Amino acid sequence: MQEAVLPKVCRVVICGAGVIGNSIAYHLVRRGWTDILVLEKGRIGCGASWRSSHLVGQLCPSVEGIMARASVLFYQQLQESGHSIGWNQCGSLYVARSSRRMLSLLRLAAEAKARGVECVVQQPKTLTSRHPYVRVEDLVGGVFVPSDGLVDSMALCRTLAMLAQEGGAKYVEGCWVQRVVSENGAVCAVDTSLGRVECENLVLATGMWSREVARSSVPGFAVPVHAARQSYGITRPVPEGIPDSLPVLRDYDGRMYCHREGASRFLVGGFEETAKPVFTHDVPEKFEFLQLVPDYEQYKSTYGQFQQRCPSLENVQLAEVVTAPETFTPDAQSILGEASEVERLYLAVGMNGAQSQFAGGVGRALSRWIVCGAPQAFLLPWDPRRFIDLHNNDQFLRERVQEVVGRRCLPPHPLQPEWRTARSLRCSPLLPLLEQQAAVTGERMGFERALYFERGTPVERPGRATPEPSYGRPDWLDNVREEYTACRERVGISDMSSFSKFYLESGSTAVVEFLQKLCSNDVDVPVGCIVPTGMQNDRGGYENDCIVVRTHHNRYFMVSPTAQQTRIGRWVQQHLPGDGSVSLRDVTSLYTVLYVLGPKSRGLLEEATGSDLRHLQPYTYQEMDLAYASNVLVLGYNNTLEPGYSLYVPSEFALHVYNRLMKTGRDYGVLDVGYYTLRFLRIEKFVPFWAEELDSSVTPLEANRSARVKLQKEYFVGKFALQEQAEKGLRRQLAFFQLREHDWDTDPWAWGQEPIFRDGQFVGTTTSGGLAFTLGCNVCQVSEQPNWGEKEVPLFPHRVL
């Protein structure tokens, strides 16, 4: 099957011939690329693929659901074409022990329906008709997905490798990848145990070895993954046999799944709440078709849950326990896409134990990215550029992976529970003071920030645990209401230091020409002005939503969303002039950012600064002294659209400035304010945010931001696409919904990612939601087809308009 000699040059080199690498090779061949080399250090499928639990389930949120659906359709097609991949479309039965879990399943079923997946809601009494072994007394219901199934991962590996080779791809087994070689910021070759291969594109699909390859490369790059132990057991035969049509049983409240294995056995697996990391220092060079020594004590709870859920099988004994390393990421999202440090180096790693579930979708999506040169917008949660250096830290990964494994069983929510492990990494100077004021903190890009403040008697919680997210009225609503009232009627202060901050400058005015090309708004403004702008791609979609502040004739200060620190820094760097005339400097940690919001904000700041702020107009800034602190940037802008200011304080002055504001603010009714309050304020004002309303597929015209686009400029990236869209009309538009016939005190809320239906047809998706205290109702922003009429949001048990 494999070639004996390495070619000297190749268009695409794929490192790793597991189910992921083979899928990418197959899909590239299908797109007409045939100069492909696949390298495998052992034999095809010898890593994680051979011991996969075969699961392919589609009741997943966001990108996971899209990938799983693509995989199911792909496996169906392969099987129907006569390829024996062991595809068994037995369906899955997802069961719920609580009303919260049931509501989560119903939300996921609504999302799946929008993707074309049939889902059948089950009452407790009907569950046994689907799965005769399941105990239902403690269940509140479930969802049956008929098109879910099982796939033989080794058969899939071999089939895809065979088809890829028939299309022209070359395979070499027994070839170790030693390092990736790059030049001028782009991949140029790969060094292997059999020699060097020059290449235009390289895909790293090497599982738990990926970090080792990255460390050895010249220069190195980050692949934040870590291996943890994962186990499943296989029972002895059930004497009476098992029905052929038995679906996979998924009891995530019990952290357990099971399915028919062969004619008469069960495979029983699970996801421990606290997993055990492995290979914490070095990954073995060879781990071909191998297992770890089983940890029966760790696995015991999983099998106990199986016996509890299927009591008629409690006397069925275990035949064996398979324990092996699986690769996980620090945020439980897979890594797929171009590395942040090296152009044309693509990562396809960290599938969090779901290689078989995602392989078909991953191959399709990454091959499209490589061939077309740009990713699809739905891949944003898996973008490697969502990380910063700390995420690749050894100790951080060792601690975080223990928590990541169990996250697969949590009900998904737009406001996920905060991580307990590896916290307090990036901290504002104000964090200790805010925690003294009972701040409940969350983490974004490793940065601690206050979510809200528990005034009164704070609730005791272990570590940095936050309340379990609710699909209805959250526990913290009264706290946020108090903060919201302060911002609307008096003055509130919020620490927003996590924003990504950059200086762009040049010796002359080259930076002006550069930003005029990158920004869709006109940034050639007088010194002292603030310009809110998008940075668009060639298709007119957002690559960045930011403000640029002209501080000098040849220097700008750019503020971008927290999650964009690596992504937009890299994107701007890729566009810098080759002559070095424009420089980019990341100054995120240089400034502590304070929002001062509310109708009394001006009075407070005038007293604190001793300045007359009547001349500080909206969208302008001044550098001024505040008490003993100098060089404080006071911006007449904030992204909630409330009256107020943004203070960019040199971090060494942060404590002094904050204390002076709080002391002076007593007479103004000042209150500390957290992120959730700002979120509610901006949603109520119909302000779109990056990664919720805005991404690389959404244009300013669709987001109602045409006023921030200056088509009369001679040129900017994306101009022609926006001109064409303005002429032809919009295919979708951001809209603002107020929910009717809805009791926000007792009913589920629209939080984001709920599908929108019109006359039973899917027409859009909510992007973010919250409570508008002023309007007195639940509101949400929606990306929808631009038509009018009655629409339904399935919030269960109701559909609301």
List PLM regions with ranges.
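Dinucleotide-binding Rossmann-like beta1-alpha1 core, especially the glycine-rich loop
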Residues: 53-130, 253-258, 263-265, 286, ...
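Glycine/proline-enriched, intrinsically flexible loops and inter-domain linkers
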Residues: 387-801
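Beta1/beta-strand and adjacent pyrophosphate-binding region of the FAD-binding site
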Residues: 3-20, 37
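Flavin (FAD/FMN) cofactor-binding and adjacent substrate-gating region
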Residues: 74-77, 83, 97-174, 178-186, ...
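Glycine-rich FAD pyrophosphate-binding loop
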Residues: 29-50
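Glycine-rich Rossmann-fold phosphate-binding loop(s) that bind the pyrophosphate
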Residues: 17-18, 22, 41, 206
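Flavin-dependent oxidoreductases
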Residues: 23, 57, 179-294, 300-314, ...
